[in-house]
Amino acid sequence: MRNRLAGTLLLLFVFLCTSWAQTSGLRKMIDLSGTWSFALDPHGKGEQEKLWNMDFAETVTLPGTTDSNRKGIENTNKSETTYLSRYYKYEGAAWYSRNIEIPADWKEKHIVLFLERTRPTTVWIDGREVGKCNYLSTPQEFNLTHFLAPGSHKLTIRVDNGKSIPGQIRSSSHACTESTQTNWNGIIGRMELQAMNPLFIESIQAFPQVEDRSAKVKITLSNSSGIGGKKLQLSASAFNTAKKHKARSAEYNLKEGSKEYEFTYQLGDNAVLWSDLQPALYQLKAEINGIDEKTVRFGLRDFKTEETHFTINGAKTFLRGKHDACVFPLTGHTAMDLEQWRRYFRICKEYGLNHCRFHSWCPPAACFEAADLEGIYLQPELPIWGGFKKESAELMDFLMKDGENIMREYSNHASFVLFALGNELGGDIDVMKEFVDCFRSIEPRHLYTYGSNIFLGSRGHIPGEDFLVTCRVGSGEGYSTHARASFSFADAEEGGYLNNTYPNSVMNFDEALEKSPVPVIGHETGQFQTYPNYEEMKKYTGVLAPWNFEVFRDRLEKAGMLEQADDFFKASGAWSVELYRADIEMNLRSKRMAGFQLLDLQDYPGQGSAYVGILDAFMDSKGLVEPKKWREFCSEVVPLLTTAKFCWTGGESFAGTVEIANYGETSLNEKSISWELKNGKKSLGKGKMAIPSGLGLLTAGTIRLTLPDVEQAYKAELLLKVSGTSYQNSYPLWIYPAKKQLKAGNVVVARQLTDDVLNALKQGGKVLLMPLEEDCKEVTVGGLFQTDYWNYRMFKSICDRIKKPASPGTLGILTNPEHPVFDDFPTEYHTNWQWYPIIKHSYPLILDGMPKEYRPIVQVIDNVERNHKLGLLMELNVEGSKLLLC
C-alpha cells in the first residue's frame, strides 16, 4: 500500500480537521444553517449538466437530511419488518446551494468551510470547484481562502450517499445501515464559515502523563514564517469538579521556520485525575497574543492493561458496557448535540454502565465530549463489518484514511481509550496488523484490537492486539471457549450456558479466559429477546415509521391473542431481566474477565427487529426493572453469591460462597458483608463476614446452614449487604418438602389417550395426560428455557442454511401464580430458575385450532413471526369431565 501517513499530511493543506475548540474573539464565524436551495440528482448527471451554475426550484432546511425535508421517493411498502421504515428514501447525489456574504473585515483572513458530518461531497464557489472530500467519521473542511473575497458569493455543495461510499460500508456498517442510522443524504451538525488570521493554531494534542502530573503538548501552527520573536502561552484549569485546580501558565518562544512544537506542561502536584468515577477535565488554552487562541479539553488519565485486566490511573477497573448501533428513531441519524449524548450516558450510568462500544461506526465530537463529562470509556470503530482484505485496495485506502482522521480528530478526549478496526472481520491478518501499527504510531493514547469478534473468536488472541472483544477465545469443545452465556443455536449447542445448564451461580468463563494473555471483553453479551410493546408505536413521530410493529400487532390480532400483547411483553421482559442478570454476574464471577458489552440495554430496531433491550429504542424505560434494582448486579461494587443450585429441600445443608466484585475507588477491607436468608419477614439464618483488602474479585467467606423442614414449598430470599454503603444484592431460593407423597386419588394418570382414558372421561372421571414426546412432534415447537436469542427470523434462516436445528423460538411462559395448581410450586407470572427442568425438557403444544378465547394455565409466549398459541399446562373440559394436559 502507499505511504498513507505522507498522503494524509498532504491532504491537511486542503482539508483541515481540528479538535474540539472554542471560537474566540480572534476567530470569526458565519453560521450556514437555515434555508438552502435544493435539487435531487438521481441519475448522477448533475456535474455533466453543470448544476453548480443553476438555481434550484426546491428548498430544504439544513442541518438536516432528505428524510427530514421529505425529499426523495415516498415509501409505500408498509409490510417491511426487517427494520423501521423511512417515509422518504433516497440514494444518490443531491445538490445544496445558497448565497453567502463575506464581511469586509475578512479580507486577507484564512477562511474555512466546516461541515461537521455529511457524506462524500464536492464544493463549488461561484461555479469554481474547490475540492472533494469523502470523510464519513470526521468533519469535512475546505480551504476557501483563495475563493472568497469580501462580497456576495454562491456556495454549492453536492452530497452523494450512493456509490461514492464503498459498497461494503454502505450495505452493512452502522455508519450507513438501514437497520438503524439509515443511509441518509444531507449535512448534519455544525455547518459554518470560519475566519482566522493567516497565522493560527492548527491543532493541539495533549498527551497526559499521570506519573509526574503533566501533559506533553504538541502544537501545530498554520505556517512558520513571520513568527520569530512571538510567544505562545499555555494555561489550564479543571472546570467540572468540586475540587478546582488551576495550573500555572507557561510561556514559550516561537522560532522562525518552525511550525511544530512539543512542550512538557506541568499541571502541578495537586492536579486532578480523570476516571469513570471522577471524570475531572481540564481546559487547555494555547494563545499567541493578539493573533490566535485555541482551547481543547483533556483528562489527566492513564488507561492501561495489567495482565488480563484494564487499569485506570493504576487501579484495576472493569468495563460494564453496552453496544451502540446509532439508534436514533426520530432523525434516522446520529445525535449531534451535547445534551442528547449527555442524556444517553447519564442513563447508562443509572444502569451501572461505564463503557460503550460503537459497532462499526464512530460517533461525532458531541458524543466524546459527553462521555468525557459523564465518565464513560469509549470504543469507536472503523465503519466496516465483514471482509478486511488486501485485494480490496480501494476499501482499504478509504478505511485507512478514515482511521487516521479519527485519531487526529478525537484523541484528546479522555473517554477515547479503546479502538477496533470494525466488527466481526475476516480476511488478512497482516493487513489488520498494518492498520493497527499505523494507528498506534500516530496515536499511542489508545489500546488497540484488530476488530471486535474477528473470525467470530475462533482464532483467539492474535499477536499485536492489546485486548480482545470476543464471544469465544479460540476453538474448543463444548462451551470451554465461550466468553458469554448465550448464543444462537447456529453458533452453540442448545444456545450456550444459560439455556443448557442446570441453573446455578457457580459457572464462569475462567476456562476460556485462561487462553488469552490480554484482557477479554465479552462481545455482544445477552441478546435476550422480549415481546414488543405496541404502546411504543406512538413515539415514532420522526422520519421513521413503526410499520414493523403494525405488522406484528396485526399478526397477533389474527391469531386471536391481541389482548394478551401487554402480558406477553411484561412476562418475557421480566424473564429477560433475570437472564441479563445471570449473564452479567457470570462475567463478574470470572477472575480474568475484563468487561462485557451488552447487546443491549436498548432495543435494536433492525435485522428483523430485535427487541432485546431493557430500554426501548429511545433509551426510555420499558418499566421492566428499576435502575436501582439493576445496579444491584451491575455496578462498580457487586456482592455475589455462588451456589450450586437455587432449588433446595427442607432439612438439606445449604452451602454458598460470598464474593465481592470490587472495582470501586478504594479497598473495602474496613467494611463487612452481612447476609440473611428470609422467608417473607421470617429470618431463617444470618451472619456477617469481613471483606478482604484490594480490588477485583474477592472471596469474603462461606455460608452454611441447615434449611428448616417444610410442609409446603416456598420461595425464600438471600440478601447480601455491604455495611455503610448502598451496595446490596439478593438471590431467590426455592425450598421444597424433602418428601411429599402424592396420592392419585380418583385421577387417571396416562401417557396416551387410549380407549380406557376416553371411557374414564365419558364417565365423569378426572384425567392427567402427559403425552409422550414422540406423539407430539407434529404439534410442538420444542422447549426453550431462555427467551429466544436476538430474533427468530434471522437465526432460523441461518440454521436452515447450515442445516442445524433451529431454536424453538419462544419467549418464556405466562401464567397466573394464584392458580391452585401452584399451591405446592411457588411461581411468578413469568419464567424463573425453578422452571428449568420442566421447560427445558418440555414440548409445548400448538393450540391454534382451539377456540380463540381459550387460554392455557401455563402459556408459552411465541415470537412475532409465528404467533402460535402454545400450551405447556392446559385444563380442558371433555365430555363434561376434566382433562389436565401437560
Q: What is each stretch, according to the model?
A:
Residues 17-78, 154, 158, 162-165, ...:
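Accessory carbohydrate-binding/adhesion or oligomerization-edge regions at the termini
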Residues 27, 205, 285-348:
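N-terminal carbohydrate-binding accessory modules
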Residues 39-43, 71, 86, 91-200, ...:
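Accessory beta-strand-rich segments of carbohydrate-active enzymes
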Residues 123-125, 214-253, 261-263, 652-690, ...:
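Beta-strand-rich binding/interaction modules
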Residues 149-152, 222-304, 709-741:
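Extended acidic/polar, glycine-enriched regions
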Residues 345, 355-614:
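Substrate-binding/catalytic cleft of secreted carbohydrate-active enzymes
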Residues 500-504, 796-884:
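Catalytic beta-strand/loop cores that center a nucleophilic Ser/Cys/Thr
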Residues 746-792, 805, 880, 886:
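Short alpha-beta junction capping motif
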